[in-house]
Amino acid sequence: MEVKIKQVDEVKISRYIIKETMEDWYQFVESDVVIVGAGPSGLSAAYYLAKAGLKTLVFERRLSFGGGIGGGAMLFHKLIIEKPADEILREVNVRLKEVEEGVYVVDSAEFMAKLATAAIDAGAKIIHGVTVDDVIFRENPLRVAGVAVEWTATQMASLHVDPIFISAKAVVDATGHDAEVISVAARKIPELGIVIAGEKSAYSERAEELTVINTGKVAEGLYAAGMAVTEVKGLPRMGPIFGAMVLSGKAVAEEITKDLLKSEIRT
């Protein structure tokens, strides 16, 4: 097979990549919302926030997205979704197989790929290989005002390198079971009054409902979504059923959108 391929030398390759990357960072250094973690709740939140017209930046420490979706259930490649979360998956064109009324099985690879694509298509920016290791805070009034970020590879190499800062009107902790961002804020800014109760063992039926109900603001400018909610609020885990995860992402997006709208009205 003969193919005429455009010739691009190494200098152009490097220049174009550096230029476009720096333009993205320059644009998003001041964001409306920073989401930490590109798992199911983080991607769902990113999708709805970007759809609402908010400048939405997602940091993911790994080189892929999906969080716990990719591992499926003990590496089985299927997951469970229940009503009404199926409406979100249908919205992003994930195929569902109904196994009983209101209960669906989905393919893990399709689920995470289409949810991420939907968030990107809506306008969210996802940057891989970046770890959030601290927050920015302000006083009068006391609030979280952004994050400090570092390359994951730098942290893995145990190099002493200062981070850079990203400003945000709202920060969402979607880091999962450890609620990493909220944990740092609770430890380093005790004035925020955050108490982390710790996640409980499995009780799927209750966990799904309680996670969505308790999703939202934990301090001014700082929000919890997904499994971070269970860690902060002392709720049970639910295992490989993901309805609450995407519903939590949607719920936190709706709350942030309302909060930022109120803030704009006041100013």
From Swiss-Prot:
Residues reported to bind glycine: 237
Task: Kindly give the Gene3D superfamilies that the UniProt entry links to this protein.
Answer: FAD/NAD(P)-binding domain (3.50.50.60)
User: How does this chain assemble?
Assistant: Homooctamer; tetramer of dimers.
Q: Which cofactors does this gene product need?
A: Fe(2+)
Tell me the residue numbers annotated for binding NAD(+): 41, 60-61, 68, 132, 160-162, 227
What UniProt keywords apply to this chain's record, in alphabetical order?
Iron, Metal-binding, NAD, Thiamine biosynthesis, Transferase
GO MF entry, a single one: pentosyltransferase activity
Known EC number(s)?
2.4.2.59
Which residues does the annotation say bind Fe cation? 162, 177
Annotated InterPro entries: FAD/NAD-bd_sf (IPR036188), Thi4_fam (IPR002922), Thi4_prok (IPR022828)
Top EC class for this record: transferase
Name of the protein in its database record: Thiamine thiazole synthase
Pathway in which the depicted protein is active: Cofactor biosynthesis; thiamine diphosphate biosynthesis
What is catalysed by this protein? Answer: hydrogen sulfide + glycine + NAD(+) = ADP-5-ethyl-4-methylthiazole-2-carboxylate + nicotinamide + 3 H2O + H(+)
Q: What does this protein do?
A: Involved in the biosynthesis of the thiazole moiety of thiamine. Catalyzes the conversion of NAD and glycine to adenosine diphosphate 5-(2-hydroxyethyl)-4-methylthiazole-2-carboxylate (ADT), an adenylated thiazole intermediate, using free sulfide as a source of sulfur.
Per its UniProt record, what Pfam families does this chain match?
Thi4 (PF01946)
Name the family the entry cites: Belongs to the THI4 family.
HAMAP family in the cross-refs: Thi4 (MF_00304)
What are the GO BP annotations of this UniProt entry?
thiamine biosynthetic process; thiamine diphosphate biosynthetic process; thiazole biosynthetic process
Note the SS bond partners: none
Signal peptide segment: none
| SUPFAM superfamilies attached to this UniProt entry | FAD/NAD(P)-binding domain (SSF51905)
